[in-house]
Structures are given as structure tokens and as C-alpha cells.
Amino acid sequence: MAILNNSVVLPVEYGREIIRGVLGRSKALELGRRLPDMRGKTYKLNVLSSLPVAGWVKNGTTPSGAADEIKNKPISDLAWQGKDLVAEEIAVIVPVSLNTLRDVENYVDIVPEITEQVVGAFQQVIDATIFFGVGSPWANFNGIVADATTAGATVSWNGTSGTSFYNAVNDAMEKVENSGYVPTAILGGPSLNSAFRKTITELGVLAGDQGEIGALPRHIDVTGGFNQSTAFAIVGDFRYLVYAFREEMEMRLLEEATLVDPATGSTLYNLAQQDMVAFRFTMRLGAAIPNPVNRVSGQLNSASTNIVASASAYPFAIITKTAGGSN
């Protein structure tokens, strides 16, 4: 174990274990697309913002005295818009009494006991931020639910049994498809299972028995970061949720620090005075929704020379549950 500035650096194998736990349980990271690790704080994504338009070569003219007709080929171009992936830090400090540590052989033995809770804390904040924008550290990143709402990609479900939820899922898929994307999953909290069990397709088949609606894989988020009162479910092309790590998990064992309340500045723990140590976990990552222009939902510009993005195009749609609906 390495000692640095009165702190203990987490052995590599424990950091990897925590990363595997976060990746395996955070639905945002499981369903999204991981990009290569960032080499700096900011990674520039080149997102297509304008597509070329091709056309038949016609409307030629024959100059006076010329034998052959001259035809002009249409001119168009490509354009890209930069989108930044910015690495921001997630952190948690876990104070532990020295009396607890005295019951084990060394400090590292307590790490597996803490790991499970650290994984849970990290996965909850990641999912809550990416899906709902809670505490978002990234400029202009409001979360998938807020951006889908702005794009008009919302479907209301009344919470009843029968075909209503089946229809709501198909309507949400249609919104994604009309935007030029292919839905890859439906995501919700635990109550999504109940909605499937009570759902009957147009053919009278229980969708819950099939496990899918429209061949769309079902995923359940149990991190505590999915607020079903805001959005009951998210349907989308999760390939367009991208993220990258700047630094994977790091842990240091603080032995002589004073921990203060971030809100008030008042002292919470004086580790040396109170015979305590604290495990400090940190991780840095960035996330973004590229949403490039495509030929399905794109629109011709005023000069009809390029295809530009539609304001209503978005790779995700949400299903909301109306008040009074039971499930």
C-alpha cells in the first residue's frame, strides 16, 4: 500500500472492482456508449450539423456557337458543430472509527466492506444526473428527460391495464423513429415490470409474458437515480448517449484531516482528535448527447443546398404517467 501526504492510495485491483460495479449497475453507463478515456479535461466531439444535398445534373444551356450543352452540377457541403465532453468530478468521503479498523488486520481489509456502498452512491448520482439533470455539472446538459420534453418527445400514459401502456410504448418509439433514430431499449424504475405484466397487445397477448414490446429490450434501474414520478420510462437510441472517463476510481485514506460541512463550513469531524480515519473516493467523467443531423428528420435550408437539423429531433422519448393512474 502506498503512503502519500498522510494518505493511502487504493490498490489498483480495488479501483477496478469499483469501476466494474459502477459500470455494471448504472443504467446510463451500461446502455450508453463508452468512448476512449479522456487525455485532458475536455474532449471535443465533432457532431454533424449540416448534410450535403445531391441532385440530378440538368437545366443545361448551349452557348451561342457551341455544339454541346453545358450543365452545372449542384454544389453543397458538410458542416460540423463542436460539442464538448467535459470531465467533472464525483466524490464521497466516508469517515470510519479507528475502533472499527482495529478489528481487522490492516486498512485495506475494510475496503471491500465499503466498496458496495460507494458503488451505490456513485451509480445513483450518475443516473440521476444523466437521465434527470439532477445537480448537472455540465453546461447546457439538462438531462435526457428535460431535453426530450423540450423537443416535444413525450407520451402520456393513464396508468391503466390493457392496451394503453402498449400503445404508449409504441408511440414513444415512433417519436424516436421519426427523429431518424432506432430505439435500442426501454428503461424505467421497478414499476416498469408491473406495467408490462398488466399490458395486453393489440392481438390480445400479454406483453409481460413476451418480456418485450416491439422487440425493445426492457431495463430496470434500481440505483435510486430514476425518478418515475417525473418520467415513468425512457425509450431511445442509447447509442447516442456517450461518456468517457478522465480518471477512474481513486481512493485515499485520510488520517489527519478536518472534515467540514460544505454548506455551512462547520466542522463535522476532526479525524485525529476523534480517533477516526476517512476514505475519500473520487472519479472524473464526462457525458453528452451528440444528436447529429440525419436525413430522416433533417430539413432543407432556405437555399435548398443543405440539410440541417430539426429542432424536434431527439434520440429519446419519455413516457409520463398521469396523476390518478394506478399501477
PLM features: what roles do these ranges have?
Residues 2-28, 34, 270-327:
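Protruding loop/beta-arch "assembly-hinge" segments enriched in small, turn-prone residues
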Residues 53-57, 103-105, 195-198, 288-290:
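Short helix/loop capping segments that flank catalytic or ligand/cofactor-binding pockets
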Residues 59-67, 109-112, 202-203, 293-303, ...:
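Short intrinsically disordered coil segments
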Residues 2-92:
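Assembly/oligomerization interface modules of large self-assembling protein complexes
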Residues 37-39, 44, 143-277, 283, ...:
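Extended oligomerization regions of viral-like shell subunits
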Residues 49, 98, 283-287:
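Beta-strand elements of well-folded, non-transmembrane domains
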Residues 74-75, 91-176, 306-327:
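Alpha-helical scaffold segments that mediate packing/assembly in large oligomeric complexes
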Residues 28, 51-54, 123-131, 135, ...:
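Intrinsically disordered or highly flexible coil/loop and linker segments, enriched in small
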